[in-house]
């Protein structure tokens, strides 16, 4: 199973750079053109990573909180793209795992996403294991 990331970034240059870096690391990218599309995708599909541009902080927080509340994406790794003047504590408190500062540098983004990739290791089983409790006995013949 391949890893999949949802990318919401209105800046075409940054989106292209991130898409190339993710593709180099073997991560398939679903690019959302707007926050409504991203909200719909988060509600209906499972992603291994969400990469959200935080220029519109309210919409980014809405997507992040919806992901954290959904059964599909509650444990999904989140990377927030923020301006250097943004309050990153809010994003970390809402569950963001990584922050990339804009404007993006290719090398800095590559190193950060490589570190994030290590945390995205997918469960090799199709479904998680569920504990089962049943009475059992041992008989010696």
Please give the residue ranges for each predicted region:
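N-terminal helix initiation/capping motif
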Residues: 1-4, 8, 12-28, 86-89, ...
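Active-site charged/polar residues at nucleotide-handling catalytic sites that mediate phosphoryl
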Residues: 3, 45, 94
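Anion (oxyanion) recognition and catalysis
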Residues: 23, 72, 93
């Amino acid at each position: 199973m391949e890893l999949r990331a949802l990318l919401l970034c209105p800046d075409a240059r940054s989106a292209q750079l991130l898409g190339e870096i993710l593709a180099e690391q073997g991560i398939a990218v679903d690019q959302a053109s707007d926050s409504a599309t991203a909200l719909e995708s988060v509600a209906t599909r499972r992603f291994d990573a969400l990469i959200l541009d935080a220029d519109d902080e309210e919409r980014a927080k809405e997507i992040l909180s919806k992901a954290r509340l959904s059964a599909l994406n509650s444990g999904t790794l989140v990377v927030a793209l923020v301006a250097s003047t943004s309050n990153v504590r809010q994003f970390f408190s809402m569950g963001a795992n990584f922050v990339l500062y804009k404007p993006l540098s290719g090398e800095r983004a590559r190193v950060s996403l490589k570190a994030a990739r290590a945390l995205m290791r997918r469960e090799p089983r199709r479904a998680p294991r569920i504990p089962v409790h049943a009475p059992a006995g041992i008989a010696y013949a």
